[in-house]
């Protein structure tokens, strides 16, 4: 076959490959197709075009009619629920109808052609059939499960000869008529045909599984229990092993059944309705590892959207960049030996340290030091929400005091209730976290390995998961946070998931307390809320669905710390979860509708303003102990006892909620953002001990803040130059402090991120220097122009004085000459203004026609990022009426309409021309007013056009923003957060 013929065959493909069918994308028909190439997937085309085997119209009509008949039969049974005798007669009638249907099914099965063989979809619809005299009626398409129970214990009734003959006929017909490919559902009244024996057996098993349900009534959010008024009757099907089971009727009145409208498609169901969740519906971003060894997915709120290297584990970084980078890689579990040398299977046994060795290891002087450091620096951001500090420290001191008395130590670690508060794995995890604040990475690895060994390896050296306890749960969460700081993202996520599952196994989410043991109740409550906070932090940071759920309408219970900061932080997280979810929810159906995306964007922007107000209300509602503002922060920053963790949590929530809009020239509450940046600078610059900042909450808040500052600085122009110059200085400071405070050589998670930020800021710093030089040159040119104008005014005044001294007959000639000079000067000034406009930096002329939409966007962005410094002048809620804001939105969303580009270009040109004319008119009017006030009656009424002379002359606007590539990447980059939310992606990650 020639290549040309092969190409034609590929172009004639009428079916899509399996990958394109899965992701619902258009397939180009190539082998492999473009979508499979981009995803490194195997391109497989189905051998059979199922469209050629569609159901016939007659077959579909039969299904619809049969479905309606089944619905009528169910409704007739429900109507007779209060009359047992009539109900029995109706059931007998249905059985007789099914028997007559079986007699006609053989003759009509061959008459309906074009119907495919009985498939799963047909089988699920044909769920009404008889089984040896037993009736089961079910309609899944109508969402109903209806069981007919014929009680054989209360009343024995012998079957009539007619029913026996019907049963025999049913059995014979079933055995003698296998399902044929051309079989179909007949239009015979009352009931569907009986399927083949294999299908009967399968359905019999499904029915047995359904009969295990203890409650035969609809379960939903509105049903309180078996005594509810809408409970369905006790009508169930009984399956017996014999084909000759008799039929009996329970003469006792059944419970009342709900009456459903005959026209409605819904029927009662035995399946519980899913609980509502306020989790995030995010479009995931996938980061494949080198060689495709793993695949990590992150949602829209994640901070890991700047670079692929941010999400790599240490082993992936080592494979990608080699072993030159210093890795904080954990050691394997020590002392592993092979118990068998068999080549087919090798049994692994871990030789754990003895209890004496472990006690000595966790009670030496170095361990005591690091244990104290953990509660000094790690308590405020995390441990205070998870571990009862006083109780754990007291028990650890007792262990250290009795370290030579092994029996006493074993009693503390193994007997109730002290074993609910402390364990070896928890002590080792705390020592490892304390070693991190001493930059002792070897000690971190040593004690972290010890903690994980005690968690999962028993005394026999075997891997176990059958023990749950609160100290083990706490140790898992602490180890997960340490793993995250060391760059092991997958390990941290999975370890925290095991811990949360263990908490559910312990029942810490039940909120049921025993007054006889208040200490355990307080511990259970504290561990739940600490786990909840860590779970929500992880969900926001990774952009993933969380595990623990708390309804914000339910009163919260905080037993051990009613007046502390735990209720404040928990309430903040609970209230903001639905807010963040609504901001980040992906709307994939508007992908090809820019106008709808624009509408959704404006709606979410409007919601964002209300959410920011709610955040401000939460902050203002704090008690005096925890409330802060900029002035309070300045006065208390040098006090080391002041806890700033609640402030950092507030910053993190605000930055996550506003992240998509902070990456636009105009799009968020810039005033609050400026306030947060200033406060964060004060904390990081003047805090007495910067080790209090060495935690993951500070790290993620700092990463989001730097990303937002990079975006804002990228939009620098003449209007916002002053504010963005301040942003640039703060950006440089934050990156320097990030390397100092977060120990990038110890916390591998920071190393590559910090390097990327440094490269980006160096580039922006060069652009800012160039912009500053241009603006300085422009300012000098303006000063020279003003000096020339002042000289011109002085000459005019001197000439006027000379005119007053000259004879009257010479004045007229001199006045004519002066008017001519004024006209020439006016023409010359207009030419200078035009030349100045032309000399401004513009995109290259040769690319105007080739890339005009991009040029148009860059020119329209010169006024899009004016700083909002006064809420009264520029309130955030009035941005929907802001012309510059709406112009930015048009650039974002109308860009994808290629057919309207020419019309849009003409409109933008006309709009720009009109704006320029209006600006010139306004300037001329202002100049005339100033001249009228300064000039005397003898001076000419028309002077050469000159710019206005305010106190601070306005700097001409530059036609380009500082770094237009950043804005363009928001629209073009498929991996951007803004792109994932508002459906800009042309390829996307929605697999």
Curated annotation (Swiss-Prot):
- PANTHER family given in the database record: TY1 ENHANCER ACTIVATOR (PTHR31313:SF81)
Where is this protein localized, as stated in its record? Nucleus
Q: What is this protein called?
A: Transcription factor ROB1
UniProt keyword terms in alphabetical order: DNA-binding, Metal-binding, Nucleus, Transcription, Transcription regulation, Zinc
Could you tell me what induces this protein?
A: Induced during biofilm formation. Expression is dependent on both auto-regulation and cooperative interactions with other network transcription factors such as NDT80, TEC1 and EFG1. Expression is also induced during mammalian infection. Expression is repressed by caspofungin and caffeic acid phenethyl ester (CAPE).
Asked if the Swiss-Prot or TrEMBL record annotates the protein with the keyword Transcription regulation, the reply is: yes
User: Whose protein is this, by species?
Assistant: Candida albicans (strain SC5314 / ATCC MYA-2876)
Keyword Nucleus set for record? yes
Cellular component terms, GO, for this chain's entry? chromatin; nucleus
Composition bias, Low complexity: 152-168, 795-806, 907-931
What GO terms in the biological process aspect are recorded for it?
A: DNA-templated transcription; filamentous growth; filamentous growth of a population of unicellular organisms in response to biotic stimulus; positive regulation of filamentous growth of a population of unicellular organisms in response to biotic stimulus; regulation of single-species biofilm formation on inanimate substrate; regulation of transcription by RNA polymerase II; single-species biofilm formation on inanimate substrate
């Amino acid at each position: 076959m020639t290549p040309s013929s092969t190409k034609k065959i590929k172009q004639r493909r009428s079916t899509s490959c399996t990958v394109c069918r899965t992701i619902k994308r258009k397939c180009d028909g190539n082998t492999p197709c473009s979508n499979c190439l981009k995803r490194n997937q195997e391109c497989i085309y189905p051998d059979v075009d199922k469209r050629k085997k569609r159901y016939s119209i007659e077959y579909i009509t039969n299904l619809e009619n049969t479905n309606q008949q089944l619905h009528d039969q169910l409704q007739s049974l429900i109507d007779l629920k209060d009359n047992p005798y009539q109900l029995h007669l109706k059931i007998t009638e249905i059985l007789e109808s099914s028997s007559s249907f079986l007699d006609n099914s053989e003759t009509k099965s061959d008459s309906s052609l074009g119907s495919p063989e009985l498939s799963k979809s047909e089988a699920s619809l044909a769920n009404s059939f008889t089984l040896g005299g037993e009736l089961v009626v079910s309609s899944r398409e109508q969402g109903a499960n209806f069981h007919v129970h014929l009680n054989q214990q209360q009343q024995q009734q012998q079957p009539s000869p007619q029913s026996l003959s019907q049963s025999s006929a049913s059995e014979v017909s079933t055995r003698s008529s296998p399902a044929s490919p051309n079989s179909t559902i007949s239009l015979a009244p009352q009931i569907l045909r009986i399927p083949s024996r294999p299908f009967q057996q399968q359905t019999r098993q499904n029915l047995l599984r359904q009969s295990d349900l203890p409650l035969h009534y609809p379960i939903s959010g509105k049903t309180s229990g078996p005594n509810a008024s809408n409970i369905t009757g006790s009508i169930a099907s009984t399956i017996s092993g014999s084909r000759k089971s008799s039929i009996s009727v329970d003469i006792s009145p059944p419970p009342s059944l709900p009456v459903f409208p005959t026209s409605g498609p819904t029927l009662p169901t035995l399946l519980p309705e899913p609980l509502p969740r306020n989790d995030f519906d995010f479009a995931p971003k996938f980061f494949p590892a080198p060689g495709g060894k793993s695949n990590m997915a992150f949602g829209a709120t994640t901070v890991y959207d700047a670079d692929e290297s941010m999400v790599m584990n240490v082993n992936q970084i080592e494979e990608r960049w080699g072993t030159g980078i210093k890795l904080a890689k954990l050691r394997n579990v020590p002392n592993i030996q092979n118990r068998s040398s068999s080549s087919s299977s090798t049994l692994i046994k871990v030789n754990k340290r003895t209890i004496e060795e472990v006690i000595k290891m966790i009670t030496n002087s170095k361990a005591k030091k690091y244990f104290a450091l953990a509660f000094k620096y790690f308590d405020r951001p995390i441990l205070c929400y998870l571990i009862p500090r006083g109780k754990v420290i007291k028990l650890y001191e007792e262990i250290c005091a009795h370290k030579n008395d092994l029996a006493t130590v074993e009693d503390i670690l193994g007997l109730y209730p002290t074993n609910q508060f402390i364990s070896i794995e928890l002590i080792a995890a705390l020592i490892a976290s304390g070693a991190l604040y001493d930059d002792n990475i070897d000690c971190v690895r040593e004690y972290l390995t010890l903690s994980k060994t005690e968690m999962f390896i028993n005394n026999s050296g075997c891997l176990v998961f059958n023990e749950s306890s609160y100290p083990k749960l706490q140790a898992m969460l602490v180890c997960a946070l340490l793993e995250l700081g060391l760059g092991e993202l997958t390990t941290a996520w999975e370890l925290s998931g095991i811990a949360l599952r263990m908490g559910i196994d312990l029942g810490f989410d039940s909120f049921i307390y025993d007054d006889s043991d208040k200490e355990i109740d307080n511990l259970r409550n504290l561990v739940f809320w600490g786990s909840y906070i860590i779970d929500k932090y992880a969900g926001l940071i990774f952009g993933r669905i969380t595990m623990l759920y708390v309804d914000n309408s339910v009163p919260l219970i905080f037993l051990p710390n009613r007046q502390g900061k735990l209720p404040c932080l928990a309430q903040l997280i609970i209230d903001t979860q639905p807010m963040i979810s609504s901001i980040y929810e992906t709307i994939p159906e508007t992908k090809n509708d820019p106008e709808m995306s624009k509408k959704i964007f404006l709606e979410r922007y409007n919601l964002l303003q209300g959410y920011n107000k709610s955040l401000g209300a939460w902050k203002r509602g704090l008690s005096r102990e925890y409330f802060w503002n900029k002035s309070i922060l300045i006065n208390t920053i040098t006090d080391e006892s002041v806890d700033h963790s609640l402030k950092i949590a507030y910053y993190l929530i605000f930055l996550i909620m506003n992240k998509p809009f902070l990456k636009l020239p105009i799009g968020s509450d810039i005033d609050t953002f400026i306030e947060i940046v200033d406060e964060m600078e004060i904390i990081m610059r003047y805090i007495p001990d910067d080790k209090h900042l060495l935690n993951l909450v500070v790290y993620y808040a700092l990463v989001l803040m730097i990303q937002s500052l990079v975006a804002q600085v990228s939009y620098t122009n003449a209007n916002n130059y002053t504010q963005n110059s301040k942003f640039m200085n703060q950006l440089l400071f934050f990156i320097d402090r990030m390397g100092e405070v977060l120990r990038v050589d110890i916390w591998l998670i920071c190393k590559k991120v910090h390097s990327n930020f440094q490269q980006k800021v160096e580039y922006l710093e060069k652009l800012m220097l160039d912009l500053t030089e241009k603006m300085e040159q422009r300012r000098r040119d303006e000063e020279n122009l003003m000096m020339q104008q002042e000289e011109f005014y002085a000459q005019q005044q001197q000439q006027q004085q000379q005119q007053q001294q000259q004879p009257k007959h010479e004045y007229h000639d001199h006045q004519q000459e002066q008017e001519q000079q004024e006209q020439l000067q006016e023409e010359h000034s207009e030419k200078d203004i035009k030349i100045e406009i032309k000399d401004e930096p513009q995109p290259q002329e040769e690319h105007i026609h080739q890339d005009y939409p991009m040029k148009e966007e860059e020119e329209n962005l010169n006024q899009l990022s004016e700083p909002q410094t006064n809420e009264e002048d520029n309130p955030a809620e009035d941005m929907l009426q802001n012309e510059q804001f709406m112009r930015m939105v048009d650039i974002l969303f109308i860009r994808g309409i290629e057919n309207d580009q020419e019309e849009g270009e003409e409109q933008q040109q006309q709009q720009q021309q009109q704006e320029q004319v209006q600006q010139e008119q306004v300037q001329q009017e202002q100049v005339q007013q100033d001249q009228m006030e300064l000039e005397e009656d003898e001076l000419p009424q028309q002077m050469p056009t000159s710019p206005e002379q305010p106190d601070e002359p306005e700097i001409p606007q530059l036609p380009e923003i500082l770094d237009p590539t950043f804005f363009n990447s928001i629209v073009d980059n498929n991996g951007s957060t803004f792109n994932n939310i508002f459906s800009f992606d042309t390829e996307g990650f929605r697999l």
